[in-house]
C-alpha cells in the first residue's frame, strides 16, 4: 500500500529495450513460447521433475534442483550424480544399467549428454546449439530417440546410434509438414514430441498435432526408420504433457491426461489404441509417468502439495508412496546459508520478499521446499542464464556450494533493491540478515494509493499446484495489496473454475485481498478482463475457436461487455498490442475490437502496462483519448501463478489506485480504477498534479494559459525519461536527479486546447531487477477543458475509421457465424462505432 499524494506521472518506453532482453531458448521458432517453454521444456524446480527406472525396478534416477540423483526406493538417501555445468534434466537409464542419457541446459541451448555410472564421467552427445530433449533408449540400448529443434527450429523426432556414450548416424525420423489448419496457439508446422519405444524396439510412439487445430495432438506410431509412414492410434486433446510410456509386456501404455477434468492424471489404454481410463484421481497434476521394468509400479511426478514431488504407484493396487530425499549426498563441498529479511523500520519482524541466490558455480539455488521461478527472457551480455528466484516469508535456509554466494532481495517497488555477497564454508551455516530500506516517498495524510494486479491466473496448466493462500503469499513477497485472479480456459479445461465466486476469497487478509474474476478468451476480438462479476461465470468463456461449437465470431466483445456490466463488473482490454497497428497494411491482420468498444462506452480500463509492448499500447491509447474518450489505465502482469518459467512475478505490472484512508476494501479500489484515479507501473512511482487537479480530475480553463504542475518520481531503478505528455505530444521533458531515480519538479506548461495530460517515465533498455521489456510508468489522464470545447482529432478519427473498416470487411467475409442474425448484429455494432469516429472530421 502506497500512501502519498498523486500528481500525474507518465512513463514512456523505448524500443531499444527489446535489443537487450531476449527470450530464453530463442532458437525455437514457434508461437506463444510462454506455453511450450513452461509445459514442455524442462524447468528448474527444487523438487523432482522426471525419473527413470533401474532394470531391477528397485531404484530411480531423477532430476531435482537442476542435477541428476539416484535413490533406492527403500532408502531416504539420494546420491547426486551430476553437478553442472548447467542444469540437468530428463534422465533415461539404459537397459545394461551403465548409461544415463539426459538433457543439459547450458550455453543458451539444451544438448544431450551421457553419464557413465561406472566412473561418473559425462560425454556430450549433441552439439550445434539447438534444443534437444526427451532422450529415450531403445530396449537394446543401441539407439536413442529424442526431440530436437535442429531442423528449422521446430520440434521433430530424431534417432541415432548409441555406442560408448556417444551418438552417431543421427537421422530425422519425422519429416516437416506445414498445415493449412487455422491454429491460434500452435505453429502451422506440425510437431512431434514425447517418443517412446515399443518393447521390441521396432516402432516409436509419439504425440503430434498432425491434422488437429487445438492442443498438442494425439498418439501416433511409426516404424523406427526414416521415411516410414506414421499412423494415429488415438486422439484426445493434449497439452504438451501426455508423455506416454509402454508397459513392459508391451500391451498397454500409461500417459497423463486431463480428459473431462481440469487436472492431469494417469491414464492407461491398449498399446494399439482403444478406450482409455484413469488409474489415478485428484484435483492436482500427476505427470511424467514411467512404468517399472517388472511391471508392478509406475513412477510419476505430482504437484499435489504445491511443489513437485516424486511418487510410485503400484499397478494393480493403487497404493501411492512418495520418494523423498531426506538425506542428500553431494558431489562437492556444500554449506548452508540462513537468510533473514526484515523491514528497516521494524527489524525485529521478518518480512516476505523475492530472493535471487547464485552460488560460486553461477547456478541458482533455493530452499529444498521453495517454488523456483525463472525469468522468460534475459540479457546475454549480463548473465549466462535467465534470473531464477524464489519467495521467502522472511526466514529461509538454502544449501549452496561452499564459496562466495550472491544474494539479491526485492520487495515490490516501495523498498530499495538490496544486493549482498556472503562466504559460505563447507559443512557450516552462514547467517545473513538483509534489511529492506523504504524509498523516500513523500507521504501525505490525505492520500492513500493501493496497489493491485488486475491480470493474474492462479493456476494455468503449469508446473506447480497453486492455492488462494499461496497466491496471497506470492503477493506478500511482492508487497502487492490486491490480486485479481482471472479464471480462464486453457484449451478445453478451466483449471480454477472451482474457485470462481462473486465473494472475496476467504484467504484474503487485512493487508491483501484476493478476488476471482474472468478473462474472456476470444481468439479473435482481443482478450477482456472482467472484474467483479457478481452473479455468474460467462460460458462459454471464449469465442472464435475454429472446429468447435464456439467457432462463430459471436459473441463479440461488445456483447460480452454488456453481459459483464449487467453483473456490475468492470471490463478492460488486456495485453493489447505487441506492435503498433497499422490499418493501411494488409498484414498483420487487425481483429481487435478495442476502438469500437471504446466508442460505444463498453470499456472501463485498458492495460497500458501488460503482457504486451507498453509503448505501442500507449500510442493507441493516446489516439483514443484524442478522440474524446475517457479511458483510464490499469495494469496486469498476466501472471501465471503456477508456472516455473514465467514473465515476471505477480505485480510485475501493477496499478495504484487512490482510495479513502479506511480499512482495505475492494469496492473503493474498483471505483477508483473506473474513475481514473490510477497510475500503472512496473517500477517507477509517480506523482502528478495539474492545475490543482490530481489524476483522473479535470482542469477547466476559459482560455489558453500557463498551468501549474507538480511532478515527482521515485524509482528503485534508473529511468531515462520523465515527461509530461499532452494530447499525444511531449509537452515537457523533466530533469531527474543524477542517479535518474528521483525527481521533484514544480513548473508550468501552456494549455490552449481541450484534451488531456499524463505523466510518464521510461527507460531505453531493460534494468535488472525489473523483469520486463523496460521500466515504464504512466498515470491516467488529467483531463483539460478549454472554453468547454469538445476533444476531437480528425486524424485519429480517420485512423480508427480505417481500423473498423478492416473489422467490418473481415466480419462480412467470415463464414463461421451460426446465424445471419448474429452476423448482422455485430456488423451493426461496428457500423455504429465507425460513425462516431467519422464525426471527428
Q: How would you label these PLM feature ranges?
A:
Residues 20-40:
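Blade/loop signatures of beta-propeller domains
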Residues 344-363, 369-372, 380-389, 395, ...:
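C-terminal functional module detector
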Amino acid at each position: 500500500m502506497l500512501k502519498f499524494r498523486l500528481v500525474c506521472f507518465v512513463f514512456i518506453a523505448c524500443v531499444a529495450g527489446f535489443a537487450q532482453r531476449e527470450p530464453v531458448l530463442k532458437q525455437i521458432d514457434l508461437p506463444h513460447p510462454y506455453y511450450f517453454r513452461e509445459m514442455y521444456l524442462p524447468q528448474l524446480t527444487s523438487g523432482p521433475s522426471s525419473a527413470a527406472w533401474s532394470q531391477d525396478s528397485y531404484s530411480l534416477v531423477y532430476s531435482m534442483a537442476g542435477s541428476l540423483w539416484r535413490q533406492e526406493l527403500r532408502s531416504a538417501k539420494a546420491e547426486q550424480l551430476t553437478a553442472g555445468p548447467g542444469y540437468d534434466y530428463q534422465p533415461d537409464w539404459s537397459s545394461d544399467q551403465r548409461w544415463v542419457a539426459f538433457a543439459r541446459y547450458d550455453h543458451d541451448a539444451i544438448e544431450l549428454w551421457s553419464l557413465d555410472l561406472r566412473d561418473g564421467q559425462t560425454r556430450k552427445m549433441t552439439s550445434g546449439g539447438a534444443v534437444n530433449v526427451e532422450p529415450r533408449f531403445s530396449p537394446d540400448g543401441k539407439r536413442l530417440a529424442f526431440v530436437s529443434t535442429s531442423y528449422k527450429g521446430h520440434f521433430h523426432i530424431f534417432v541415432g546410434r548409441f555406442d560408448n556414450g556417444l551418438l552417431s548416424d543421427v537421422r530425422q525420423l519425422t519429416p516437416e509438414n506445414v498445415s493449412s489448419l487455422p491454429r491460434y496457439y500452435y505453429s502451422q508446422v506440425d510437431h512431434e514430441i514425447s517418443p517412446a519405444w515399443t518393447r521390441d524396439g521396432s516402432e516409436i510412439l509419439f504425440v503430434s498435432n498432425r491434422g488437429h487445430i487445438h492442443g498438442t495432438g494425439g498418439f501416433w506410431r511409426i516404424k523406427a526408420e526414416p521415411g516410414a509412414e506414421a499412423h494415429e492410434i488415438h486422439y484426445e486433446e493434449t497439452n504438451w504433457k501426455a508423455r506416454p510410456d509402454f508397459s513392459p509386456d508391451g500391451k498397454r501404455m500409461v500417459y497423463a491426461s486431463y480428459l473431462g477434468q481440469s487436472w492431469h492424471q494417469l491414464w492407461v489404454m491398449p498399446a494399439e489404441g482403444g478406450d482409455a481410463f484413469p488409474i489415478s484421481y485428484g484435483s492436482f497434476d500427476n505427470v511424467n509417468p514411467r512404468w517399472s521394468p517388472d511391471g508392478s509400479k509406475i513412477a510419476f511426478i505430482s504437484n499435489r502439495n504445491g511443489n513437485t514431488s516424486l511418487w510410485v504407484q503400484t499397478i494393480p493396487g493403487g497404493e501411492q508412496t512418495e520418494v523423498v530425499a531426506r538425506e542428500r549426498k553431494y558431489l562437492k563441498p556444500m554449506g548452508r546459508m540462513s537468510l533473514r529479511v526484515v523491514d528497516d523500520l521494524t527489524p525485529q519482524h521478518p518480512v516476505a520478499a523475492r530472493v535471487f541466490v547464485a552460488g560460486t558455480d553461477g547456478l541458482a539455488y533455493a530452499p529444498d521446499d521453495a517454488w523456483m521461478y525463472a525469468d522468460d527472457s534475459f540479457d546475454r551480455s549480463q548473465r549466462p542464464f535467465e534470473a531464477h528466484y524464489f519467495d521467502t516469508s522472511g526466514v529461509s535456509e538454502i544449501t549452496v556450494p561452499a564459496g562466495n554466494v550472491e544474494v539479491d532481495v526485492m520487495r515490490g517497488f516501495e523498498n530499495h533493491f538490496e544486493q549482498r555477497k556472503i562466504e559460505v564454508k563447507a559443512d557450516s551455516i552462514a547467517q545473513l540478515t538483509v534489511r529492506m530500506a523504504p524509498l523516500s516517498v513523500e507521504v501525505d495524510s490525505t492520500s492513500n494509493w493501493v496497489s493491485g494486479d488486475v491480470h493474474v491466473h492462479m493456476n494455468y496448466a503449469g508446473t506447480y499446484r497453486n492455492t488462494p493462500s499461496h497466491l496471497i503469499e506470492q503477493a506478500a513477497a511482492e508487497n502487492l495489496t490486491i490480486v485479481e485472479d482471472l479464471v480462464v480456459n486453457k484449451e478445453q479445461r478451466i483449471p480454477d473454475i472451482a474457485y470462481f465466486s462473486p465473494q472475496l476469497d476467504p484467504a484474503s487478509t487485512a493487508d491483501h485481498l484476493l478476488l476471482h474474476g474472468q478473462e474472456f478468451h476470444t481468439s479473435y476480438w482481443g482478450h477482456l478482463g472482467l472484474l467483479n462479476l457478481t452473479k455468474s461465470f460467462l460460458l462459454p468463456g471464449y469465442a472464435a475457436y475454429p472446429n468447435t461449437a464456439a467457432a462463430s465470431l459471436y459473441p463479440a466483445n461488445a456483447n460480452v461487455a454488456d453481459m459483464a456490466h449487467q453483473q456490475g463488473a468492470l471490463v478492460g482490454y488486456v495485453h493489447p498490442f505487441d506492435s503498433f497497428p497499422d490499418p493501411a497494411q494488409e498484414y498483420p491482420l487487425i481483429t481487435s475490437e478495442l476502438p469500437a468498444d471504446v466508442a460505444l462506452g463498453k470499456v472501463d480500463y485498458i492495460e497500458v502496462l501488460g503482457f504486451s509492448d507498453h509503448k505501442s499500447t500507449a500510442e493507441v491509447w493516446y489516439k483514443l483519448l484524442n478522440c474524446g474518450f475517457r479511458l483510464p489505465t490499469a495494469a496486469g502482469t498476466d501472471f501465471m501463478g503456477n508456472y516455473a518459467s514465467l514473465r515476471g512475478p505477480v505485480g510485475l505490472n501493477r496499478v495504484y489506485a487512490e482510495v479513502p484512508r479506511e480499512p482495505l476494501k475492494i469496492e473503493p479500489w474498483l471505483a477508483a480504477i473506473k474513475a481514473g484515479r490510477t497510475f500503472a507501473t512496473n517500477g517507477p512511482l509517480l506523482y502528478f498534479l495539474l492545475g490543482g487537479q490530481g489524476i483522473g480530475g479535470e482542469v477547466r480553463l476559459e482560455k489558453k494559459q500557463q498551468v501549474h504542475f507538480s511532478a515527482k518520481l521515485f524509482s528503485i531503478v534508473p529511468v531515462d525519461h520523465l515527461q509530461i505528455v499532452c494530447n499525444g505530444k511531449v509537452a515537457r521533458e523533466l530533469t531527474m536527479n543524477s542517479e535518474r531515480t528521483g525527481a521533484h519538479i514544480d513548473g508550468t506548461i501552456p494549455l490552449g486546447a481541450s484534451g488531456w495530460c499524463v505523466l510518464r517515465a521510461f527507460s531505453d533498455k531493460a534494468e535488472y531487477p525489473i523483469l520486463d521489456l523496460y521500466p515504464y510508468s504512466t498515470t491516467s489522464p488529467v483531463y483539460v477543458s478549454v472554453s468547454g470545447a469538445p476533444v476531437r482529432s480528425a486524424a485519429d478519427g480517420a485512423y480508427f475509421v480505417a481500423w473498423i473498416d478492416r473489422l467490418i470487411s473481415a466480419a462480412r467475409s467470415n463464414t463461421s457465424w451460426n446465424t445471419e442474425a448474429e452476423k448482422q448484429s455485430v456488423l451493426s455494432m461496428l457500423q455504429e462505432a465507425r460513425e462516431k469516429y467519422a464525426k471527428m472530421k
